[in-house]
């Protein structure tokens, strides 16, 4: 955020520039066992959308990008094996992101169809269903911490 403000101010004074902030499809749903990550990505999305509005007409383009699972080192160390086909190639995500930026979009969703479903479906379902499904998914990745028993 500090870097965006510092460089954004210089871009405004020059009357030109562009900012792409990396959010995630996780910005659209609560993720038990990854709560801080999902909340941070929601912040990045909302920060970027608000900043895009504030800087509109001042020569600085702002876009948030919300990819899904991408073939990077992010998932190293999870205790379950992730299917190879479950990830978008990083090159594809970058290419689609830059195309969206060229098209002057304020938010980009560069992933496959399942990423679009993961972004839009939680807006339609009851929240308890969304949280339960997300908890199941993060638990299967080995991210769940055992609950302490009351006794």
Q: How does the language model describe each region?
A:
Residues 20, 62-65, 75:
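Hydrophobic structural elements of the Rossmann-like NAD(P)H-binding subdomain
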Residues 67-77, 81:
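Short, flexible catalytic-loop segment of classical short-chain dehydrogenase/reductase
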Residues 10-11, 29, 50-61:
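Active-site-adjacent segment of SDR/Rossmann-fold oxidoreductases
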Residues 24:
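Residue(s) in the substrate-gating loop at a strand-loop-helix junction
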Residues 4, 40:
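Active-site helix of classical SDR
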Residues 6-15:
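A short helix-coil junction within the Rossmann-fold of NAD(P)-dependent oxidoreductases
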Residues 64, 81-119:
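C-terminal helical subdomain
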Residues 31-35:
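Active-site loop immediately N-terminal to the catalytic Tyr-X3-Lys motif
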């Amino acid at each position: 955020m500090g870097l965006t403000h510092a460089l954004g101010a210089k871009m405004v004074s020059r009357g030109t520039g562009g900012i792409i902030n990396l959010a995630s499809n996780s910005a659209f749903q609560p993720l038990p066992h990854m709560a801080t990550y999902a909340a941070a990505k929601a912040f990045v999305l909302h920060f970027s959308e608000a900043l895009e509005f504030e800087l509109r007409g001042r020569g600085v383009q702002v876009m948030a990008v919300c990819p899904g699972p991408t073939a990077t080192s992010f998932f190293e160390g999870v205790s379950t094996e992730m299917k190879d086909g479950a990830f978008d190639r990083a090159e594809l995500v970058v290419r689609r992101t830059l195309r969206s930026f060229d098209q002057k979009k304020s938010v980009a969703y560069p992933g496959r169809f399942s990423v679009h479903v993961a972004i839009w479906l939680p807006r339609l379902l009851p929240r308890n269903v969304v949280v339960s499904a997300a908890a199941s998914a993060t638990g299967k990745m080995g991210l769940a911490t055992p609950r302490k028993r009351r006794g």
